[in-house]
Every structure is written in structure tokens, then in C-alpha cells.
Amino acid sequence: MSSKNFMVFSGTATRYLAERICQHLGCPLGNSVITKFSDGEFAISYEESIRGRDIFLVQSTFPNSDNMMELLLLIDAAKRAAAKTINAVIPYFGWARQYRKDKPRVSIGAKLIADLLSVAGVDRVITMDLHADQIQGFFDVPVDHLYGSGVILPYLKRLNIDDLVIASPDVGGSKRANTYAKYLGCPLVLCNKTRERANEVASMQIIGDVKGKNVVIIDDMVDTAGTITKAADIMKAAGAKTVRACASHCVMSGPASDRVQNSALEEIVFTDSIPYSNRCAKVKQLSVAEMFAETIRRVLDNESISSQYLV
């Protein structure tokens, strides 16, 4: 892999992660300028030649929508500057929960975002823990889908937890949690929840035994933390010795930090796909920079990506 043939650039949302990725790749972060105007619009420019280069653009697309618009403009500018290939590295893919038409007269946001990226000129997407695997099929370009388990599972192994039980906070996440349980060689329990409205859990029941166990709840993301904290409190009340949680994406919006801090959770472990500034003492973040750097290296060297997946 020659650093002369590729360059890494970043939007403003995840510059910290792009810098760490570059450290692992042994290359400098490319020089781009994002100028924001008084009316809220912004313009993108590359301050060095990218002609004929393989370009990797690191940008998570968590709210607000400016982060997605930045990425689209970065792609467009790279295409117009004659980059050889344009690879969008999107650690957290926003709008992924809008992946199906679950009621009449609604949009399918994930499909629209995939179309926008393709029209802008992206050649490849590298992302992590999509809310629904089928979103990969929304794209007309290759998608390398990584998993946060690549850093979370080794962390759990190092803890060497006795009487371990893996839990899924809902039936929909049972496949993900079951993979963790198989890898760690421990039982799986499920939570069955019902919602009255978005971000609000009406009721929840445990399917399985947690009495005297150390429970780790597995999810893909935590938004308002209503589900994960309710599950932790119910499991603690059912006799669990300790309750932890692990999720790839630290959305943590609204009351999430207070809910986690005041819950039965001992800790909640995320990756650094999204920056977290509201410092809740129970939140820990593990870096996925090395995993993304290794994926970029394999893309450049035409090596298998799937062989590094743990889930």
C-alpha cells in the first residue's frame, strides 16, 4: 500500500476519528476547507490536488442534517477534481431506522440517503452496524459493512465476567445478541417490549432467567436510552447481580445521559462512531479507528474484508 496513491479527508462531524484512522495508516489527514456562510450554507474545497487518487472521506451522518450535506458536497467536489475513486467512510449511517414503510404515507429515508450518495458520485461505502442489514441493498455501489463487535467482544473477553448472560433489549435484536452469546459461550435472554409511541417504551417482560447472573445487554445503538435503562432496571429487580450494556452507536439524545446515570447499569460501552460530549460517568467509548484503517488498507490492496468480521 503506497500512501502516494490514496488520501484521507474528513468532514467536521468525525474529524477526531479521521485523525486516529490516519495515525494507524501512517498518513497525514488531507487538507480540505469547509466554509460556512452567515445564512447557514457552506462550501467545500480541497486545498491540495486529488487528481487520480483513491479518496476516503470520513464522516458520520448523525443529526443535524448538515453532516450529510457536508459529505455530499465532499463527494461532489472530489468527483469534479478528478479523484480516481471516492470512498465514503460512514461510521454511523443516519436515517437507518427509516428502512421500511411501516405505515401508510411515510418516506423510506435510508433508501433516499443511499440514492443521494450514489448520485453525488460515491464509488464505495464503508459503514458499521447498520440498523437493518438490508440497507446494503439500497446502494448501487459496493458496501463494506463492519461490526462494532470487532472492538466490543474483545473488551468483554478481557473483563472475564463470571455467570455471564447476554441479553437483547427486544426481539428484533435477538440475532445480534445471540452471536455475542455464542462467541462468549453463555446463555441468551430476551426482552419483549411494546411501544406507545417513538422513543417511549410502554411495557417490557424478560424471557429467560437472570437471577444471580451478570447481564450484558447488546444493541446496535442507544438513542434516548429508554429501552436499555428500563431493561436494566427490570433485570436488576429480577435478581441480576450486575447489568452492563454495549452498543455500537452512542446517539444518546435528549434525556439519555440522565437516564443512564440514574439507572441500574454499571456501565454502558460504545464505539467512537459518534462523538459524546455530555460526560456521563457510566459511559465508556472504544475506538474503531484501527478497524476502519485496516479496512481501508484491505480495500486498497484488494484483500478480503469479510475475514476481519467477528459478527
Describe each PLM feature range:
Residues M1-V311:
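PRPP-associated nucleotide enzymes
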